[in-house]
């Protein structure tokens, strides 16, 4: 994402002690530094985004819709739009953060393309998914109430065309405690290597712990199968971050 906005700022939101941290919010301050924050916090993020573009080239079909659910600043939307060769398609990018939506629209408008994009400020749980050849949940599901996750995946499955794909990227938890601890610590090392201090890491973690509730790969796969997807697999992973593909059967 960092190549989309030459004016993006370095993330120093948590560099000094904050008395009342509260819960994490995707507000104006976060939106302003988001490209830098996500590059330095999520291992493999830029790879996932560029490969989402490659997947769009394979899966997006003519006369269909593409959904980017929890689009933030539109990195996945732009990657998909650059790679879509099918005609008469539309991308619907949704986020519930006004600050993200405003900036996302500016990013989208900065690039010309044959494929129209509609950026909507809304709760993704209220979006009607229809005639979709591709749906992206890029580090979004983990911020939903766990009770709402299965229902959303069910609606995505129902709204996908046969042969359509869901890309689900998440931070993972692990049933094996030793593996979980190792990957947690390696992610900590990753952030430290990217210039974050112990104070920044701990303050951000405190704000996220009540808001971002992660699942294991096994839980994700189980939910996706329960929704109706027959073809489900992890296609990318770096430490405790990764992405799954769920493909709706061509004859379903």
Curated annotation (Swiss-Prot):
Q: What is its EC number?
A: 2.1.3.-
Described by its record, this protein's role is as follows: Catalyzes the conversion of S-adenosyl-L-methionine (SAM) to carboxy-S-adenosyl-L-methionine (Cx-SAM).
Give the family, as the similarity comment puts it. Belongs to the class I-like SAM-binding methyltransferase superfamily. Cx-SAM synthase family.
Q: Which reaction does it catalyse?
A: prephenate + S-adenosyl-L-methionine = carboxy-S-adenosyl-L-methionine + 3-phenylpyruvate + H2O
Q: Any idea what this protein is called?
A: Carboxy-S-adenosyl-L-methionine synthase
Q: Which organism is it from?
A: Photorhabdus laumondii subsp. laumondii (strain DSM 15139 / CIP 105565 / TT01) (Photorhabdus luminescens subsp. laumondii)
Q: Which GO terms describe its molecular function?
A: carboxyl- or carbamoyltransferase activity; S-adenosyl-L-methionine binding
Keywords on record: S-adenosyl-L-methionine, Transferase
Q: Describe the protein's quaternary organization and the partners it interacts with.
A: Homodimer.
Q: What is the lineage of its organism?
A: Bacteria, Pseudomonadati, Pseudomonadota, Gammaproteobacteria, Enterobacterales
What is the name of the gene encoding this protein? cmoA
Q: Name one GO biological process term.
A: tRNA wobble uridine modification
Question: Sorted alphabetically, which InterPro entries does this protein's record hold?
Answer: CmoA, Methyltransf_25, SAM-dependent_MTases_sf
Q: Would I find S-adenosyl-L-methionine among this entry's keywords?
A: yes
Which parts of the sequence bind S-adenosyl-L-methionine?
A: 45, 70-72, 95-96, 123-124, 138, 205
